[in-house]
Amino acid sequence: MHKVTKFAIRHLSDKASRFVPKAGVYPKGYAVGGIHCGVKKDGKSLDLAILQNTFGKNASAAGVFTVNKFKAAPVQVSKKILKEKSGSGINSFVINSGNANAVTGTQGMKDAEDMVLVTDSVLENPTNSSLVMSTGVIGNNLPIDKILGGIPKLASQHLGNTHQHWIDCATAICTTDTFPKLVTKRFSIGDDTYTLAGLCKGAGMICPNMATLLGFFVTDAPVTPSALQQILKYAVDRSFNSITVDGDMSTNDTIVAMANGAAGGEVIDNTSSCAERYSRLQAEIVDFAQQLAQLVVRDGEGATKFITIRVKDALSYKDAKSIASSIANSSLFKTAMYGKDANWGRILCAIGYADVTSANSVIPEKTSVKFVPVDGSEHLNLLVNGEPEQVDEERASEILQNEDLIVEINLGTNGGQSADFWTCDLSHEYVTINGDYRS
């Protein structure tokens, strides 16, 4: 049994510890782990992680990356490898935290390539079989010697498939996170049983548009690269591309997936003959990705609330998502939520300037807004068919005392399309954390 390093990111608060699993179910044919190699300055925080496929050397992989024009070196290198290999034969991920290796010029590209080279060598992979990710401070070169020295140590002594190995891996990719984000799930397709495991990091600089958030999930289901890429893109659009903490899109946003087929069964592809199995897997991965993405919002820097923006009866999914995003990214709305202020005018303002597809996408006279408590108690109407309600401020205050809240907007267009978006409030603590980030 390889060694594991028990380490908590910080002293976990009662709130944070609720979201860290005490056990999990893990897919066959993988080994993971994390160690401290010296990127982080405190001398102990885990900052290097590896995930390895141990079932043959021909796993399928897929990736969705940031559209920020200042793409970090590891993003560029991983995209290139995925494209060159058409998603086939990717067998490991290597990740460092504490330094983003972004806007680091030619040296940054060489460092990312060297991380791939050394990882492939120590894991006895074919050339360019690893994807590389980095997260942390932008604009500084990696302490590459420490990372390249840590990779062999991690690979030879600290990889395994126990729950603690997965917790170490999840911890090692964190920066300002207050808890490691890990989700596992077992599901069936027909007579075959498969497992998903996923982890991600993120608490600030979160407003992804992957057409300093990292995530990866793996399964032992047999899936072709093209099917996995399509499913991942669909799932990310409805999960990681539907969250926001602060409206800032990172240079390093990356979500990758791997499927090694270790659990056997019929290969899942995107042909019509496999439509039922494909659809079932897609539904499982969408639900799984949403669970992971919501953990990022729950760990939003300084956040005290987890808010679901639910837009219903839109003309199109695009309209519904755009309106939900507009509200979720509104600093005025988010600060009102922190202040427990039922200022629904800020919600209407954000609806009104959302980027929608037609003049009929939003009709004020048909628009309704309400607060929906998650405890099943009575909702609170704020606006009904464009007419303001006499708001019970005491009831509003009661609802806003809760950590979780649903803000539901019904556009009344008879289009029948809906979208959810997840956000948090914006607090004084967010400013403190980010003002002190590099100190």
From Swiss-Prot:
CDD domains (UniProt xref): OAT
Marked site: Involved in the stabilization of negative charge on the oxyanion by the formation of the oxyanion hole: T135, G136
Positions bound to substrate: T175, K201, T212, E301, N434, S439
Principal EC category: transferase
Reactions catalysed: N(2)-acetyl-L-ornithine + L-glutamate = N-acetyl-L-glutamate + L-ornithine; L-glutamate + acetyl-CoA = N-acetyl-L-glutamate + CoA + H(+)
One GO MF term attached to the UniProt entry: glutamate N-acetyltransferase activity
Site (Cleavage): A211, T212
Record EC number: 2.3.1.35, 2.3.1.1
Pathway: Amino-acid biosynthesis; L-arginine biosynthesis; L-ornithine and N-acetyl-L-glutamate from L-glutamate and N(2)-acetyl-L-ornithine (cyclic): step 1/1; Amino-acid biosynthesis; L-arginine biosynthesis; N(2)-acetyl-L-ornithine from L-glutamate: step 1/4
Location relative to the cell: Mitochondrion matrix
Cellular component per GO, a single term: mitochondrial matrix
Active site: T212 (nucleophile)
Keyword set, alphabetical order: Acyltransferase, Amino-acid biosynthesis, Arginine biosynthesis, Autocatalytic cleavage, Mitochondrion, Multifunctional enzyme, Transferase
Record PTM: The alpha and beta chains are autoproteolytically processed from a single precursor protein within the mitochondrion.
Other observations noted: This protein may be expected to contain an N-terminal transit peptide but none has been predicted.
Subunit details: Heterodimer of an alpha and a beta chain.
Similarity section: Belongs to the ArgJ family.
UniProt xrefs under PANTHER family: ARGININE BIOSYNTHESIS BIFUNCTIONAL PROTEIN ARGJ, ARGININE BIOSYNTHESIS BIFUNCTIONAL PROTEIN ARGJ, MITOCHONDRIAL
Function according to Swiss-Prot or TrEMBL: Catalyzes two activities which are involved in the cyclic version of arginine biosynthesis: the synthesis of acetylglutamate from glutamate and acetyl-CoA, and of ornithine by transacetylation between acetylornithine and glutamate.
The name this protein goes by in its record: Arginine biosynthesis bifunctional protein ArgJ, mitochondrial
Origin species: Candida albicans (strain SC5314 / ATCC MYA-2876)
